[in-house]
Amino acid sequence: MTVINSNISAIRASNASNSANKMLGLAQERLATGKRINSAKDDAAGLAIATKMTADVRAMGQGIRNSNDGISLAQTGEGALQEVTNMMQRVRELAVQSKSGTYSTDDRSSMNAEVGELQKQIDDVLTNTKFNGVTLFSKTAGTDVSVVIATGGSATDAVTLTSKGIDGTKLTSTALDVTDAAKAATTITNIDDTLKQVTATRASLGAGQNRLESVVNNLTNNATNLSDARSRIEDTDYSSETTAMAKAQILSQASTAMIAQANQSQQNVLSLLR
């Protein structure tokens, strides 16, 4: 039966054309943005998962940066204490030298002058060594300096760097004096005591640095794996989408041609009236 009020073929072809154009637009959007999920309507569940993964990856990235800052802080402190150790060793050496009875008062005075300069520098390093404004050392025995390094988004994701307190009373100009044998002996005792504290602080900072380096390695691996998983969820598969776009283009062209054919068949009805 031939009718003219409803062109079912043209309607069906038009619907097919609309579907093909939507498919084409979606494929082109995904290819242009590189994202399979560009809005919640594309994949609501996938978007939620990918968003959470993105938050985790960014937190890990900041944790890596924080950890590297912590490593730099530990290196700054350890480097300063290395110089303090060298100076303290030199003071001890001069004290041992001063204990010998072969040196005159003038000789010991010259030795003490060097000790005095070293004492000032030791005090300066322990007082003024800072990292981004954070004081790294305490000159009070038993009073430690602790710096918490956030390594992730959770409250428990943290590493504490601890700088042990160093007894500053044993590093004063009075405590380090080699003007006579008795004072030199006291100086040796004071140096030995504080060297133990300095060594303990260096060990603490070194252990913290090693832990932070492990944290960086672990976070880097986790962030890489999580980024890869997120990519599989939200990123465009170019081979698949290119195929989908080609298919949509063919369907769009074919449906447009069929619309023309369906409209032409309606025109043929006129020939029956001639």
Regions found by a protein language model. Give the residues of each.
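Primary detection of the long, small/polar-rich alpha-helical "axial" segments characteristic
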Residues: M1-R274
